[in-house]
């Protein structure tokens, strides 16, 4: 076979086209038994390719993949096969595994595929594929058909209307193909027609791209038919493969890891076009590779989360704007119209708005408010005044003439002032102190304090001192005094006032404590 020539087997449309080593598929001769009636083809390296001579009777051959050691080993004598309508062709392919394609899934569901194909077609064509990684031979797996599809070469269909299945080979890929007539599939009994329903038509589309060559695997179309001669390819008449759904799953697993490795080496723009794998199984169900999902994700289609975020975002923005404007304007109105200070004229006894009203308008509270500042000082002054009054009382008891000389006009004004202060509700300690400074007020308070000491039993005064009023009544010469009834009335009034003052002072002390 020349480097640019195309040689085909007559009657089968199974031809091979080889080109350069970088773009073509190198064929290595596999040791096979030579029999009569075999023809050989030369590969680019000078090796021979043995072909079966009985390929003329095939009308619609179907390709059935056999994994590794599951190729049938039972040999049927060639004499029995000559001239029979069930002429068969077994193609044994050994391929070096590509580093980028790994098959890990295990499956052995393809043992009966060839017999089912033979049941449907009078002249089936079985292909036996086995993979080798270096010198180590892996266990037969159902996913090795995927490796065969990934490393064998680029498969192009004859008709554009048929399905596609191709693979671009790597530069370092070397493969050997041997077609011999010594290997036959085992004869099997006819199977019931009910079992044929389990195997359905599946369209396999495998697109793999090798980053070293820069060759891009594309769907074949009218514009791409001119590039078929540049690549070595193996074309078959029947582009459909009979595969069960279990083999579909294993093939998907085998191709996933290799495609993921190649995806890391290629730029992102080509990933959505180059690496797309779709498998059609039972009922038209479609399972895609992660790269296909990545290609779909690259399209300008928003994810559901983004859609939800876009739906929620305008609502949130609108609410935020409306709320922000409302509260902002409300705050500005408060700031633009501050509360003006009160312009009322100052009134005594009425507190201005905004100021702490420490003193209430009750009649007894003003004294308490003023005593808040005097506090202990007023109490100390009162004790001193009591002591002075006690001394004056002792002096008055010794001097009886001073008791007779009490002027009535001087004693009346303090009483009237005390009544007025009680009526107005503005009693001051200072007014009492000022009244005590004058002579008349001192005399009146002396009598008041003496009565207070008698009623309350104050211990500050010396014990055993008689009351001054009783002494005044007992003085010799005062019994017939016309002023005695008036003085007694004043004494009664003073006692009443004293009791009132005492109650006020007790309340004040309890308030301070």
Curated annotation (Swiss-Prot):
Any Pfam family: DUF4641
Biased composition (Polar residues): 37-48
Keywords: Phosphoprotein
Keyword Transferase: no
Phosphoserine found at: 43, 84, 123
Region ranges (Disordered): 1-48, 210-229, 236-287, 390-414, 453-481
PANTHER family: GENE 4779-RELATED (PTHR31866), PTHR31866:SF4
Listed name of the protein: Uncharacterized protein CXorf49 homolog
């Amino acid at each position: 076979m020349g480097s640019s020539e195309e040689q085909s087997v007559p009657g089968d449309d199974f031809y091979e086209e080889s080109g350069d080593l970088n773009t073509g598929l190198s064929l290595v001769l596999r040791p096979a038994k030579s029999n009569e009636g075999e023809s050989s083809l030369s590969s680019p390296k000078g090796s021979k390719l043995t072909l079966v001579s009985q390929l003329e009777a095939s009308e619609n051959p179907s390709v059935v993949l056999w994994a590794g050691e599951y190729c049938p080993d039972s040999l049927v004598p060639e004499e029995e096969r000559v001239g029979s309508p069930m002429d068969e062709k077994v193609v044994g392919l050994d391929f070096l595994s590509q580093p980028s394609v790994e098959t890990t899934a295990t499956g052995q569901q393809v043992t009966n595929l060839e017999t089912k194909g033979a049941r449907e077609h009078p002249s089936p064509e079985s292909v036996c594929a086995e993979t080798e990684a270096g010198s180590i031979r892996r266990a037969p797996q159902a996913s090795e058909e995927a490796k065969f599809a990934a490393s064998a070469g680029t498969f192009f269909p004859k008709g554009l209307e048929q399905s596609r299945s191709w693979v671009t080979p790597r530069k370092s890929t070397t493969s050997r193909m041997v077609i011999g007539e010594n290997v036959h599939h085992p004869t099997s009994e006819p199977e019931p027609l009910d079992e044929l329903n389990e195997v359905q038509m599946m369209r396999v589309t495998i697109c793999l791209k090798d980053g070293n060559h820069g060759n891009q695997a594309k769907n074949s179309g009218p514009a791409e038919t001119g590039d078929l001669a540049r690549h070595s390819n193996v074309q078959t008449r029947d582009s459909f493969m009979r595969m069960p759904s279990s083999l579909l799953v294993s093939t998907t697993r085998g191709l996933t890891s290799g495609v993921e490795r190649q995806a890391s080496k290629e730029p992102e723009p080509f990933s959505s076009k180059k690496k797309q794998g779709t498998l059609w199984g039972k009922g038209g169900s479609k399972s895609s590779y992660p790269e296909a999902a990545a290609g779909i994700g690259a399209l300008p289609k928003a994810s559901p989360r983004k859609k939800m975020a876009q739906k929620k975002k305008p609502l949130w923005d609108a609410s935020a704007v409306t709320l922000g404007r409302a509260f902002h304007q409300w705050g500005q109105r408060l700031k633009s119209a501050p509360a003006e200070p009160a312009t009322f004229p100052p009134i005594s006894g009425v507190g201005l708005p905004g100021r702490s009203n420490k003193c209430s308008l009750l009649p007894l509270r003003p004294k308490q408010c003023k005593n808040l500042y005097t506090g202990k000082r007023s109490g100390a002054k009162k004790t001193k005044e009591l002591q002075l009054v006690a001394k004056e009382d002792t002096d008055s008891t010794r001097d009886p003439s001073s008791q007779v000389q009490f002027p009535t006009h001087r004693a009346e004004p303090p009483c009237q002032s005390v009544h007025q202060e009680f009526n107005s509700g503005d009693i001051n300690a200072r007014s009492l102190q000022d009244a005590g400074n004058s002579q008349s007020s001192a005399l009146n308070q002396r009598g008041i304090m003496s009565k207070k000491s008698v009623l309350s039993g104050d211990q500050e005064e010396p014990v055993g001192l008689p009351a001054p009023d009783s002494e005044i009544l007992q003085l010799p010469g005062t019994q017939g005094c016309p002023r005695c009834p008036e003085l007694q009335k004043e004494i009664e009034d003073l006692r009443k006032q004293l009791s009132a003052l005492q109650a006020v002072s007790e309340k004040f002390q309890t308030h301070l404590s």
